């Protein structure tokens, strides 16, 4: 029987639509533009350098992307934005249609916006103009259609304007002709030394008049004709910006560029095809897929040149990437990438290795070629290790050198780790020692795995021992990870609910949330509790207990179920820990609750910052029933899929299908599993089995079962 879905599509025709490239219709780019989502709204293509979209005045933390649904004032259409971050930056090379050169902002209504992947439009009143935006990887394309009452077609080019921390320090229009403007904008912000060069071309002759304060008035010759603006960007030079533009947008067919952007999105969205009768979940899913591909961003020009982490220009034989929010994305976004974007991985690995060679360590949080050192731990290590262990890195020795050297530095608390075997809270001036120590431990486990793979036994032993340092912070008396002093005493008093942002032993969290940050050795953590029963009792309590975190708690602690904070990344693996102790049904119930309550088809549809794709990647993986808990190596824990079928295109013409029989909101519990037609009792599946292609068939029911309970079947 064929089940008819909302909108008139059947499950059969949905699959056909996926293959014919119609998935962009299921994307709602407004999800996450309100609340604390901090999501970019505008025109871009998958993993593009350019994110062309509206910029509003920076009014606080919720404007980190330059846009928030609560606002109705525009100050420009900038060519670069961040998505889902907790710090604002970029906003480079902004244009604004104006009545005259004195105008610096425009009111707008969300009712007059039209947005879909690769396209943004808005109708403005003062001036009366229809603004349309689209983009390629390295160029933006704008079309301004002025109303019949318009006296002039005028734009202001603003090179001083930026978002959040961004402050322009050097900018100019360096060259103009009758139809072109070229220049640069150098800024200091979250990215300490960002260089942006641009080359803009207009569809009709223009005059360019400097207004001062980084603003230029551009007046077109004919107000009765649409004014089109094509702008190439580069971090290397204006000449490269021109090359990028000539290569990617050689003509003036705006509709074709929109169609090409739509096709690019459809191609990538079709990496996962789902079948479901729930139209809302379908929109949430494909919007989540869309959000996972805003970054990493291409950061090399069409001629291969890119600006390195040392500020020098390099000729690369690979695609270089930036916007590496690794503390967030090592958990789900990159493991998802290793499943459906395998073609990107060799270049991604080359990016990491070359960043190491240029700055002396792997990236921590890289933005526009700049190391921001934002967040804690060594998050570049698990991402690179995962690519090595999964077979996508040719230069394994170079990758290992980068990991080892990064783990053996003395900065950011690692010197204390080498001296004491942990990070004493009384010796680390920047605080957050428990969070740092736990992150270093899981990264060390990844170094150990690669060392063992390469036959480096002594190194493997050393880093395996260091990866056990998490046990030093565990206080068996209270059952929490706690700050430890240099003389071996736990910090007192112990209030596991308390959270003092940037001033205690945790990063954007508390003891309840950080006690579980041992994804690389869950069984070792269980032993610290004494036995599985005590571990489960504590884990059960996590989702029930409530308490006051205090006035200075981080706003990132959000999306709470008890003290489980889905709105922030350190919690993202925790639900799956039940599989490790033979109780996958508890994970299933909580997974369904989280998928249902923390993701909505609404502008306020995310429970926390989108964090450059991580929040959405969790949804993508968990909704199809898989999650890589251990940071590297490819062990994907099986959860509770919400779709009747998910088809993952894993490359080389192969697909991995996840089929759920008897699935419904009530039938959330796995009863039995078959892998390629044969009974499968394990509550996890290995990466290599996924990438071979095949079918994982799950029989679902409304009661817990014995599936996955035996010790031999646990992760």
Predicted feature descriptions by range:
Residues 1-18:
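Bacterial Sec-dependent N-terminal signal peptides
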Residues 16-334, 338-382, 386-438, 446, ...:
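Accessory carbohydrate-recognition regions in carbohydrate-active enzymes
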Residues 443:
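ATP-dependent phospho-/nucleotidyl transfer catalytic cores
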Residues 656-662:
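Beta-strand-rich recognition domains
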Residues 669:
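Extracellular attachment/recognition segments
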